[in-house]
Amino acid sequence: MSTLADQALHNNNVGPIIRAGDLVEPVIETAEIDNPGKEITVEDRRAYVRIAAEGELILTRKTLEEQLGRPFNMQELEINLASFAGQIQADEDQIRFYFDKTM
């Protein structure tokens, strides 16, 4: 029998936790487009939204710009992160959430 603690220990979901606002829907769409074949889960907690995938989740500036319909600076996403799950690697073209090791 699996306990909630066991499930949490073996949870390899990674991704952004974004403050509620104008970026939420474009980031969800971007996660789905930039991570084909991955199941993207979304938990809306009113004040913030948790967007996650198993093991790795990538968000690209190009796709975010397409979804927003305007130029986008990746630092704008970083400012709106309440938190994140996993490790993070960011540059001017993409943000990658990942785990080096899985449980």
From Swiss-Prot:
BP GO annotations: toluene catabolic process
Top-level taxonomic group: Bacteria
Phenotype upon loss of function: Cells lacking this gene show a complete loss of toluene-4-monooxygenase activity.
Keyword Cell inner membrane appears in the UniProt entry: no
GO MF annotations in UniProt: monooxygenase activity
Pathway connected to this protein: Xenobiotic degradation; toluene degradation
Keywords on record: Aromatic hydrocarbons catabolism
Family of the protein in this entry: Belongs to the TmoD/XamoD family.
Subunit structure: The alkene monooxygenase multicomponent enzyme system is composed of an electron transfer component and a monooxygenase component interacting with the effector protein TmoD. The electron transfer component is composed of a ferredoxin reductase (TmoF) and a ferredoxin (TmoC), and the monooxygenase component is formed by a heterohexamer (dimer of heterotrimers) of two alpha subunits (TmoA), two beta subunits (TmoE) and two gamma subunits (TmoB).
Protein name in the entry: Toluene-4-monooxygenase system, effector component
Organism (species): Ectopseudomonas mendocina
